[in-house]
Each structure stands twice: as structure tokens, then as C-alpha cells.
Amino acid sequence: MWLQPIVVLAAIIIGARLGGIGLGVMGGLGLALLCFVFGLQPTAPPIDVMLMIVAVISAASCMQAAGGLDYMVKLAERMLRKHPSRVTLLSPLVTYLFTFVAGTGHIAYSVLPVIAEVARETKIRPERPLGIAVIASQQAITASPISAATVALLGMLAGFDISLFDILKISVPATLIGVLVGAFCSMKVGKELEDDPEYQRRLKEGVIENRLVETASSFDVRKARISVGIFLLATFLIVLFGSVDALRPVFQSDGKNVPLDMPSIIEIVMLSTSALILLVCRIDGIKAVQGSIFSA
């Protein structure tokens, strides 16, 4: 029935416009219409996917509270300012790496103002690096070993003797090549700023100001490095568990040896990562939930 996809699309669009928890609650309203009005039977809620997202976001939020995200942004800023003429090529690689490591695209938001500033300083149209940088951060979700998308695919292919490493050796090169091709194409988007009359007019009238974007510098470098190190170690362990089945704990179920599933491993490892960051770096847990990653 053609009304059903309209209900789904309307719930997504309205939820996205509401922002915050709007997408989630509008999804519930859309489900209510499909269930009670159209008589469709709802499936089981994706509990594992939701728990994985919560676990990964919790770990990333704790890393941000420890200054790890600011430390990563500082490193990215240093690299971009060292090679400003290559910002269109380097910025998507930076956001790709951020998302690949964290498993969520929200972590890449912090570096976008730096990318825009470096582009303006170099007289490069900001939409060139910014556009492909945002795309790259989303492409990395399908290649990240700890993203819900990758683990969901791993679960679907569980009966075909396909490991996490088998997925990554296809998804990582494919997405990286696509991002690089897109970056090269983005280098020719629009006129050069010095040849753009509208940009020159706005610059002359003071509508556009080349203000300096200051990244956070008040964080404890030692704690920041430790938090990033713990997070990277957790990501490595997840790849290891997903690639080598023999490393997973095995339990008896109906007389058969059943290894611990990857969603549970990701949830356990990432929640443990959150705890370790809080304990080792001595971070206030309330500070973690007040950060931009958790609220996003």
C-alpha cells in the first residue's frame, strides 16, 4: 500500500526537523500508525543495535570528557595547517579516521570548523573540503569495526563462515577509494574564491569575516593521551575478537559449544572502556553525559 512508505518517510523527515530525540519519538508515532491503523505486525526491536550504539557513544563521551577528542582535533588541526593547500584531500581522511576509530559520525563534527577556517585562509572554497569531509565521516561507518552497521552485517553473515576481518578487507579499501575519488572531484567544485564576485562582494562589505577558530587547549594532555590509547586498544580488541573466533569465550547451549556473539563483545568491551577511562583518568561521570557527543 502506497500510504505506508509515506508514513515512514514523513516520520523520518519530521523527526529530523524536530532534532534531538525527535527522530526517535516520531519513529514511535510512525510505528503506532503502521500497527494500529494499517494492521502491520511490528518486529522485535533492535535491542543489540541500540545497546551497541549506547556502549560506543558512552566510551566516546568518556574519552571526550578526558580531553581525548580535543587532543585528536589538535593533532588534526596541526596536520591540516602544515599542509593547507591539500586541505581538500586531507580533511576527508581526517574525518574518515575519526569515525573509523570511534564507530560514530558524531565525533567528526568537532574538526569541521577547523577545516572551514584552513580552507578560507588558503583561499579554497570551504564547501570543497567540508562537503567531502562529511561524506567521508559517513562512509567510514560502513568500514568501522565497532559501528552498529558493520556488526549488523556480521550478524547477518554469521552462517556463511565470514569473519569481521573478511568484511573489513572489502569495506575499508572500497570506502577509502570512494572517498579519495570524491576528494579529487571536489577540488573542481565551484569557482575559485578570488574569481567569485559574490564572495568578493561579501568580503568587501564585511559580511564574511576570517575569524580565527580556537580549539580547546585547557585539557590535560596526559589524561587525553591515555583516554585515546584506551579507546584505540578497545577498537583493536574488537577487531581481534571478530577476526579470530578461537579468542571468544565459549558457552554450552543445548549441548553445543556456542561462542559469545559479537554484539555482546562490543557492548562489554566498550562499556569496560568507559569505566577504565573514568577510573584511570579520574573523570567525573556527569561531565561525560554533558559533552557534545553524548547529547548528539
Predicted feature descriptions by range:
Residues M1-P5, L29-F38, V111-E127, K169-T175, ...:
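Hydrophobic alpha-helical transmembrane segments
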Residues I14-A16, M26-A32, L40-I124, R128-P129, ...:
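Membrane-embedded alpha-helical segments and adjacent helix-loop junctions characteristic
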